[in-house]
Each structure stands twice: as C-alpha cells, then as structure tokens.
Swiss-Prot record:
Gene name per UniProt: IRF8
Protein's UniProt name: Interferon regulatory factor 8
InterPro entries linked: Interferon_reg_fac_CS, Interferon_reg_fact_DNA-bd_dom, Interferon_reg_factor-3, SMAD-like_dom_sf, SMAD_FHA_dom_sf, WH-like_DNA-bd_sf, WH_DNA-bd_sf
Localization annotation: Nucleus; Cytoplasm
This protein's record includes keyword Nucleus: yes
Family according to the record: Belongs to the IRF family.
Organism per entry: Gallus gallus
Gene3D superfamilies: 2.60.200.10, Winged helix-like DNA-binding domain superfamily/Winged helix DNA-binding domain
UniProt keyword Hydrolase present: no
Gene Ontology biological process terms from the UniProt entry: cellular response to lipopolysaccharide; cellular response to type II interferon; defense response to bacterium; defense response to protozoan; dendritic cell differentiation; immune response; immune system process; myeloid cell differentiation
Family matches, as SUPFAM superfamilies: SMAD/FHA domain (SSF49879), Winged helix' DNA-binding domain (SSF46785)
Length: 425
C-alpha cells in the first residue's frame, strides 16, 4: 500500500489555511471545496504589499521552519518554496484555464486531486530503482511540473544556495580532526589501495557509494583508498583545489546526467551540477564515516548521528561532520539481538541541492548518494540471515555478533554489491 504522509502534510495544512479565512485572496473556488484560489501578485508590482500579498507564502515558510521573526524577509523565495511544493505534490493540480495572472489582483487556481485518482506506482521505470522508499510515492510528473515555468528553475537553484541551515544543537560536540588537511600517514599505501593497510582496519576504510538520479540507480563504486575519497564532477585541475585533494585520496566522479531519460529532469540535474563542482570529501575509519563539503551547492544528509531525524540536516561548508557512528551501529545491533530495539540502518544518504528529509518522496529527488562502510554492510547481510530467532540467550547473541564482525572485517572479504540492489529509505 502506498502511503503519502508527506504529501498529506501540505494538503492538510493548506486546507486549514483556506478554511481559516486569514489570508487575503486565499479562498475556495467552488462550493464543493475541490478547487481553491491562491494570490499570485508579482513582487515587482507597484501596489505589491508584502504583508498582504506574501502572507500565505510566509506562513508556509514559518510552518516549514525556514523563517522566523527577525530573519531577512525574502518574499520571492517564500513564494517559490510553496509553488514548488504544490507542483511536486500529487495532491494538487493547477487549473490553468481558471487562473487569472493578467489582472490587478492575479491568482492561480489549484484542484485538490482525489486519492482515488492518485496511482501508487512501484517504480519509476525499468531497471533498478528506489522501489521501497518508506511507503512513499510521487507523481511521475512531479519534477516535470517543477520545470514548467522557466524562472522556477533559476529560483529553485537560488533556494539551493540561499536557504539557511536548520537549527543545530546548542551544545556542540568537540571538534573533529580534518584528515584532509593533514599529511597522510607514511605507513599507509597511497596509490595501490589498501593492500598494505592493517587488516583490522581495511574493512572500515572501504565505502560502498551508490548513485541514484530521480530514483533510478545510475552507478556504484567500492572505494579502496584508506585516506578516503573525493566525490565530485571532475579531476581537480588547479593548485588551490589540490590543497584539498592529496594524492592519497581516491577520486570518485558523479555519473553523467546523460543516463537520465527525461529531458527536463536531465536539464535541471545539469544545472545543479554547476553548483557541485568541488564536491565533498569522505573518510571512513573504525569510528565511522566523516564528510567535508567543499561545493557551493547545498548538501543534506541522514545517518545514525543526525540530531533531528524529522527535519532537513544541512552540511555546513568546509566543516568536518561525522555522519555515521560505527560503535552506535553495533550497540543498536546488539539491542536488536536482545529484542530491545529495531534493526539498525547502516546507510548514510546524501541529497544534493534539495532539502532532505522533507515531505518530498525520494523518487522526486534529483541526486541521492548512498554511502556505507563495506564491512558494516556485510555485517547487515549476515545478521539478516541469522537474526530470525531473536530469543537466543544473551551470551550466544553477543558471541554471534562478534563472530559475524570478525569474519567479515578480517583479511578475506567477499564482494558486496549486487547488481539488482534496491534501496529502502
């Protein structure tokens, strides 16, 4: 069954605002309350009144946590946010023949699409895709709608650069070492992968990186350099860039956007690429996975160290962030064996250019990158085979977890990635 709780959030909120009659111009279009008008005056008009004409857009920004009193007012950004949310949502459909945009008080008309009209599709297309995204789905034309009005693309990419980060914890953690600004250890191999690296650590240093464009699997790689990797569009070419990319770092490139079949999805993805040129740095060790954002475009993430799991988490530029805690993963796995918790998630998700997590289903995200530690992923596979009887004695369970970990993270590691891998987020 397909459950679009994310879409319901916008739908229910907007219906409540219309019924409140607090926003000038936001009214029902018909008695059946299946269509509504929303004011659409351009901010450049002489008679534009921000308090009136932008009130519903501001309310959405406040509701989403993107604006609070005292912040700089950005009515154009507020409007773009709500417009793109409406265009992406399968719950709404613009009724263009009823909209009036060339009058003194312009407005658009949207129809609330009945649930029975909304088809829950399992996949975006043939081949590997995000076939299980937390029981969420989206209209196949969601990103197409985003591209209908050419200005929306530039404004949308403007949001990518302008939006503030969500509130962070008041008590900050101790600073994390910046491995990329340190000299690589001479005991580690710099070119030939992890051959000479300590066997106890080799499984931690390798990462499995999987790329999804608009929900479709477009590429994957298992890294082998113990110092980490740089994920970007091209090889660094100037001296300044090389300061961030020592020779010991493996270079991992984003797959080409040419793999995207839909022309408009391809167009906006290429535009987004323009803001991701410098990419991000990734490092994995016994403690976990760490990232450093270098690119201009925003990067959002989810992992087992995220503070707020129900709101977007943005990476600050040039700051090293721990996005996966290996010890926490194994503690949660032990709790699962003790029948005291859920099966832990081994994955980190990176979303480039778009807020994440939010109400937009994952299939509508332009660029998603999944990152996992190689040995932890293999532990998950083995644990999934052996955890069918969670009522084993505690001492047996602890020994079982230890044995699985030792077998997988030892010197003889087996290949991980399966070509038909599907991701459940």
């Amino acid at each position: 069954m397909c459950d679009r709780n994310g879409g319901r959030r916008l739908r229910q909120w907007l219906i409540e605002q219309i019924d409140s009659e607090q926003y000038p111009g936001l009214i029902w279009e018909n008695e059946e309350k299946t269509m509504f008008r929303i004011p659409w005056k351009h901010a450049g008009k002489q008679d534009y009144n921000q308090e009136v004409d932008a009130s519903i857009f501001k309310a959405w920004a406040v509701f989403k946590g993107k604006f609070k009193e005292g912040d700089k007012a950005e009515p154009a950004t507020w409007k773009t946010r709500l417009r793109c949310a409406l265009n992406k949502s399968p719950d709404f459909e613009e009724v263009t023949d009823r909209s009036q945009l060339d009058i003194s008080e312009p407005y658009k008309v949207y129809r609330i699409v009945p649930e029975e009209e909304q088809k829950c599709k399992i996949g975006v297309g043939n081949g590997s895709s995000l076939t299980d995204v937390g029981d969420m789905d989206c209209s196949p034309s969601a990103i197409d709608d985003l591209m209908k009005e050419p200005p929306c693309v530039d404004e949308y990419l403007g949001i990518i650069k302008r939006s503030p980060s969500p509130p962070q914890e008041t008590c900050r953690n101790p600073p994390i070492p910046d491995w990329w600004m340190q000299q690589p250890s001479p005991s580690l191999p710099l070119v030939n992968g992890y051959t000479g690296y300590e066997q106890h650590h080799s499984g931690y240093s390798q990462m499995v990186i999987t790329f999804f464009y608009s929900g479709r699997l477009v590429g994957h790689i298992t890294t082998s350099y113990p110092e980490g990797c740089r994920l970007s569009l091209s090889q660094p070419s100037n001296h300044g860039e090389k300061l961030y990319t020592p020779d010991s770092l493996e270079h991992v490139r984003f797959p080409s956007a040419e793999a995207i079949q839909n022309d408009r999805q391809k167009q906006i993805t290429k535009k987004l690429f323009g803001h991701l040129e410098r990419g991000v740095l990734l490092h994995s060790n016994k403690q976990g996975i760490f990232i450093k954002r270098l690119c201009q475009g925003r990067v959002f993430w989810s992992g087992n160290t995220v503070v707020y799991k129900d709101r977007p988490s943005k990476l600050d530029r040039d700051e090293v962030v721990k996005i996966f805690d290996t010890n926490l993963f194994f503690r949660e796995l032990q709790q699962y064996y003790n029948n005291q918790g859920r099966f832990p998630d081994s994955r980190v998700m990176l979303c480039f250019g778009e807020e994440f997590p939010d109400t937009v289903p994952l299939r509508c995200k332009l660029i998603l990158v999944q990152v996992e530690q190689l040995c932890v992923r293999q532990v998950m596979e083995e644990a999934g085979k052996t955890c069918s009887s969670p009522m084993l004695p505690d001492d047996v369970q602890q020994e079982q977890v230890y044995r699985i970990f030792q077998d997988i993270c030892g010197p003889h590691q087996r290949p991980l990635f399966r070509e038909n891998q599907q991701i459940a987020v």
